[in-house]
Curated annotation (Swiss-Prot):
NCBIfam families reported for this sequence: PRK10859.1
PROSITE patterns: TRANSGLYCOSYLASE (PS00922)
Organism: Shigella sonnei (strain Ss046)
Gene: mltF
Catalytically driven reaction(s): Exolytic cleavage of the (1->4)-beta-glycosidic linkage between N-acetylmuramic acid (MurNAc) and N-acetylglucosamine (GlcNAc) residues in peptidoglycan, from either the reducing or the non-reducing ends of the peptidoglycan chains, with concomitant formation of a 1,6-anhydrobond in the MurNAc residue
Listed GO biological process terms: cell wall macromolecule catabolic process; cell wall organization; peptidoglycan catabolic process
EC number: 4.2.2.n1
Protein name from the UniProt record: Membrane-bound lytic murein transglycosylase F
Amino acid sequence: MKKLKINYLFIGILALLLAVALWPSIPWFGKADNRIAAIQARGELRVSTIHTPLTYNEINGKPFGLDYELAKQFADYLGVKLKVTVRQNISQLFDDLDNGNADLLAAGLVYNSERVKNYQPGPTYYSVSQQLVYKVSQYRPRTLGNLTAEQLTVAPGHVVVNDLQTLKDTKFPELSWKVDDKKGSAELMEDVIEGKLDYTIADSVAISLFQRVHPELAVALDITDEQPVTWFSPLDGDNTLSAALLDFFNEMNEDGTLARIEEKYLGHGDDFDYVDTRTFLRAVDAVLPQLKPLFEKYAEEIDWRLLAAIAYQESHWDAQATSPTGVRGMMMLTKNTAQSLGITDRTDAEQSISGGVRYLQDMMSKVPESVPENERIWFALAAYNMGYAHMLDARALTAKTKGNPDSWADVKQCLPLLSQKPYYSKLTYGYARGHEAYAYVENIRKYQISLVGYLQEKEKQATEAAMQLAQDYPAVSPTELGKEKFPFLSFLSQSSSNYLTHSPSLLFSRKGSEEKQN
């Protein structure tokens, strides 16, 4: 996956550039058949999407997601409300454009030559590759050549179907596959790890998120190179919507909003470690149940799952952990820090967790107010790891290298430079193991993604079991057995003042279609 960026891949680029050149004179309000004028007269922007971990989802009725957030800001930019329609699969999305039921498709859709024959693409904002996945314990194919429809299934409307057909026509005549009209890519990946399906194909970002919860899913091979992701609108000769999108994305790029959204939803990294993730999830089952009450008790302003992720990064949830540098306990506190916090026994799990939270809150309070509220936690964690003074040096170095010292995406790139003499020799507080602070924060984010997604999967399984029990014993009301609410990725949906993580975790796909007004 590549970084978020503006990429002007428009099939009708001459017409689009003309629309941009004439931007000030476009009669948005005066022409009845002008697309922007119609949207503003209607008072709402109609966007169709699908439920995925990255694009759109809800917690307690509150929507979130990369594409949702961008669409909401675009609606605000146009001065209208956002109306979201959730569809089951990609084919239904394009049906909405064909039938005039949507102004835009915002669903992490890949730009390709077939789609742009019939639909207008917008600016591209990140990229993915398509990959064949399998279960770790099963046979790993090294080529597509011998795969059959009994082995390979893909989701309806998936962009890879065109690529598979090209490969069949030019290279692998024996290749065949099946399209499951009822399932999306996430459900098909679940089928793979459950042994119901040998192989499927999904995009690299979706796979990366899925692996944080299901490390037994592995990539067999790449099917495509990196492909840009974009939005689509009707291709009807009216360029006003395309021009507005271009201007909007340019503005978002220039003021740093795109970079912040990239860091929020895509900043978890894509360097998956199977052994580490599997070990962590085993600890979630074996160790976390005893520690969960303590994390919930002392979490206060942060999500308890974030606190649990911090503690795992520090000590692997070992209250007796000791470092050669002298730090000890669940939260690996120094002797001086422990004394300043009134901790008498660093190896006492409760004292250590309580003290660690107070120390983190102290770091949070020192982060400059100019840092966006939803990014302050990352600055605080870097300070927690290497010291507040060195975090200030990292911000200063970021500014010197023409970055934004208030943007975590920029500052974290400068952290490794704190251990390089040409840089630290010119800084106020000198040498620091900035590369360790970088890895520290990134690991915590990955652990929380895994933890929240894994706990959610267990909640889902428990709810499904309860519903099945109700069907087996109909005298028990299914709604009574399944009514307990469970945390659909609440670490992303709650207000930024809770200092929760900003990388999305895996959500199971929702079926059917829904409409939401925002």
